Amino acid sequence: MLAQFDVNLVVLLVLLICGLLSQNAAVTIAAGILIVIKITPLNQFFPYIQAHGLNLGILILTIGVLTPIASGKLSGESILKSFISFKSLVAIAIGLLVAWLGGRGVKLMSSQPDVVAGLLIGTVAGVALLRGVPVGPLIAAGLLSLFIGK
């Protein structure tokens, strides 16, 4: 009986429940989709999802961030003004720092997969319990890389 016990499925179910209890749609939907994939023949796509899911997620996030520019909601004038406002210059600097940390995080997660579980647990807990957003693993890994010198 223990041989049939799937710890990973239980973890996904716990995440689904945490997402539901915290009313976090991102965690709920992600866990639900992964459960469906896991228990159906769709599980053959896990290698593809693992290989390309992060890049696809970053692409979708980038599209979401750039949409106000494309739609005209963020005018060219306000974009140009961002280079003369102190607050906007600080925002640009922080954006550069976070992008750099995310890049370090991707490298660390690729080279040291043993830290991925801890980063994921912390990120999911932050999303489910603290109303965070799931961009945390990359930034967390980038910060970790600064502490461990990788």
From Swiss-Prot:
Subcellular location: Cell membrane
Membrane topology label: Multi-pass membrane protein
GO cellular component annotations of the record: plasma membrane
Pfam families per record: DUF441 (PF04284)
Main location: membrane
Entry superkingdom: Bacteria
Transmembrane segments: 22-42, 45-65, 83-103, 115-135
Keywords tagged on the record: Cell membrane, Membrane, Transmembrane, Transmembrane helix
Family of the protein in this entry: Belongs to the UPF0756 family.
HAMAP family xref list: UPF0756
Protein name as annotated: UPF0756 membrane protein A1S_2121
Species per Swiss-Prot/TrEMBL record: Acinetobacter baumannii (strain ATCC 17978 / DSM 105126 / CIP 53.77 / LMG 1025 / NCDC KC755 / 5377)
